[in-house]
Amino acid sequence: MFIFFIFYFFYTMRIGGIAMDLFVKPRKRENIDAHNAYILGSDFTSLVTACYLLRDGSLKGEHIHIIDSVDSFHHYEPYLSFVDNRSLYLWDILRSIPSIETEGLTVLDEMTYLNHDAPMKTIHNIQLSDQLMSELVHFFFTSDEQLEGKQVKDVFSQDFMESDFYYYWHALFPVNDAYSFKVTLHRYMHILSSQGMISPKYCIYESVIVPIIEYLEAHHVVFHFNTEVTHVEIEDNEATAFTIKSEGMEETIDLTKHDLLFIHTSQSKDSIAHVVITTHDEKIIHYLRNILQIDPLSGEDITGGVIPINESAWELNWTIPRQPYYKNQKENECVILLHGLHPEKTGDYVEKSMLESKGYEICAEWLYHLGIPQDKINELSLMSASTVPYTHTSTYCEAHVNGLNYAYIGEGVSLPYEYPGSLDYLVHTAMNAVYSLLHITRSIPTYRYSIEDYLSVFSSLCGDETFMETQSFTKRLVLKELLKRIEGSDLEALLKEYKFF
């Protein structure tokens, strides 16, 4: 089976590398000062689009207009709050965003230093047996055509579907079709190693989005709130006008040949509910301390990602991020993030759906699955503040073709072999849109895995044992003969480093 990993390493070399002009400042386009850019929507993708227009497109801030029907910036906390250490597109933009906490540093500097000094840890046991590992490797080699129209349950055994690995992975990436599952494995397999994920100092909104907003405001980008876009006119593959409605008045804005239009779009299905639990109850914190064997208020990363509750009807998963999660959080408070993949189903403790439940009832359901004695659940749940669930939808992309002066951004944009539920994906769509309309020649980063990446993941899935120790006696004899052929080589040293034998 190890040979499969070696072959797969060479197979995925096609993913790409890094070109020299990735590090070059793009040339300023002729007549760029005559351009105006209109971005329809003010979510994270729209903000990043404005950043690329400023930095790489050389547009003036006062020529960039962000238009949205919301009334303020407080609408931006993305669902997927974890960030992996291969978020190349996110890093590319954050390296240019000044920190609002430490003068002279960027947001990328700040996040990097934090995770070097206090890296995320994992408490998950997601090891796979040799049989299940073989299933996973075989799946890696399955062509996209063979997976068309199939669900994950159609290509894996029941044992695999009930494994801790699958529950963990499905909690992170709630996809059911086989192709999307394969995409997430190829793109994010490195997070299975001990330092595959990183975390910001506070929530994504305060650590990433607020600095971006301040960067845009400092460059005089124009925000139009309480303004609804009611119509976009497109003729012969060119956007000619769009209509807005504000304070009951409609206005049509005509676009010239120098104007650019960015349209936020998404395609959705399968609602997911999210709840933020805030507690200062020492009894709950004591239970969490015993369960996790770490103090939730220590300031370190606590759970190392999501913890799925396998037997939950709502398919709950939860995580305790680095505390404090908010800048203004009280010293003795603990914030827990709770997600329900099936909020429409009836709960196991609460006899109603998650969407129908009040905050304290959702908290009670979570405490029930933690194993808290039932005679104490109701009392403890009332001692915690819990927001009612808000819904997010797992996105299914469609192909959107850009026009001569307009481009699509956001989760609804189809990118080959990418998972749309990450911050990195959103930045990628913004970068593509700006670069295509302004014909920027700077290279777009591409992912590339090394053999060390695959061996590191392989080692994580084998657990404390070496790969050789997980094999049958007959297989060990064959593998020992193969190892004799590489004795004394760099490959032998590499295999030892990653616990192959």
Report each predicted region and the residues it spans.
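Rossmann-like flavin
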Residues: 123-187
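Glycine-rich active-site loop/strand segments that organize a redox cofactor
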Residues: 69-92, 173-178, 183-192
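Dinucleotide-binding Rossmann-like beta1-alpha1 core, especially the glycine-rich loop
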Residues: 76-147
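Active-site-proximal substrate-binding core of FAD-dependent oxidoreductases
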Residues: 436-492
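C-terminal segments that line or cap access tunnels to active or ligand-binding sites in enzymes
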Residues: 190-198, 258-260, 265-428, 435-436, ...
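Helical element adjacent to the flavin cofactor pocket in flavoenzyme catalytic cores
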Residues: 187-259, 265
